Amino acid sequence: MIRGAWMYPREDEAVLKICWEPRHSDKPCADSERAQRWRMSLASLLFFTVLLSNHLWLVSAGAKARGSFTFSLQPANSSLLPPQSFPGEGRGCWDTFLSNLTKSAAQPPHCTGVRSTHLDTACAKLHYLQRHRGSFSPSYPQPSSWSSSYWSYPPSSFSSKRNFLKAYFRNYTLSFCDTYTILDLLLGMSNPDSLDCSLESLMEDFVGAAAASPALIEGEVCSSCIQAYQRLDQHAQEKYEEFDFVLEKYLQSGEYSVRSCVGDCKAVYKAWLCSEYFNVTQRQCRHRIPCKQYCLEVQTRCPFMLPDNDDLIYGGLPGFICTDMLENHMSNTEAECCDVRWHSCKTQGSGNHNTSTKSTDSRFKYYPHHQHHRDHHLHPYHHQHHQSLLPVSAGSRLGNTRLRLCVLVLMLLHTMASFSVVQNGVTLEPLPGLDDSSSHEE
């Protein structure tokens, strides 16, 4: 009895041990299922993280592209102007004015500091200031032998009046070539139509009006100069309209194979055309380049037209050719235009290259050179000192894509390595338990 009672519990333990033995082998399976669910959750989290990061990259890239058209150019000689000489003369107004230069044929913005629509009355307003506000009145009693010459004023008074004229005419621009202020024209192109339109002549016109002829009292010199500039501006607009007509004709005809971004072509052509009519330096820009650089931009961006060959699609000669491209000498008096970065419309998400010629909202700016409209001028020496203004290649876009792809691959590799470590840890964890059970059985 005692022996039987002693042996039966041991037999029960053996039976229970045999019954529960398979359950020890089920634990690794449960751990592997939990590890699998963990891997799936981690993979889903990684996937959504990649999508979110890609979305943030796209949003930041779009914001950067929109912010690249915000200009902060200031006049080079800003010390000539008092802070609040005229309404709207502050930095914000100039930023608005310069941002308008990115449009190939748009109207200038409403800005009280920069006016092109009231250019006809600019001389009358200046004459009004001379008569009623005493802007040009001498600060000391006039001598009896005072003549109409402005040289009778002391140097300090002469300098202040000259600065006032600069400040005044800096706030007026042309109608079509609206990237030019009247001050730029007076300083760089003082002889339109054989007229004397220098600042000294205008000072003699207004300062010496009291002792001069009645014609000078009415500001005839100022009005004549403004009208001469307006005639050149109108002539440039007529030439631009002729070019626009030809370009539209080629685009609307199905027998011509034009492949180009028309907004680019029209913007750079207007910039080059105005620079040919007005041989002046753009002074409100900090960084300037030779205006002849614009010629190559037109040749590069305007479409290649093949009206007599239906077989070729992307070949042929450009519709605009720059001559005298071997000219390599540099003149000290050469006009300089703003160093503009031309952003192709391809970078704006436009898939259709045959854009209508009426689309004039391309992101560009344009500035000045040369009075006569000749298809020439390019200085190769410029490329040694400034970045090229050639069309933006796909290198920058591909660089961003490659960067995102590399980051994605690295994240996937890291995830796979983490999964391998977790999987190895799960498979190795039940091994000590199996060794213990075998030792107990022994």
Curated annotation (Swiss-Prot):
Glycans are attached at residues 77, 100, 171, 279, 354. It is a multi-pass membrane protein. Its main location: membrane. Keywords: Glycoprotein, Membrane, Transmembrane, Transmembrane helix. The chain crosses the membrane at residues 42-62, 406-426. It is found in: Membrane. GO terms for cellular component: membrane. Belongs to the NALF family. Probable component of the NALCN channel complex, a channel that regulates the resting membrane potential and controls neuronal excitability. This is NALCN channel auxiliary factor 2. It comes from Xenopus tropicalis.
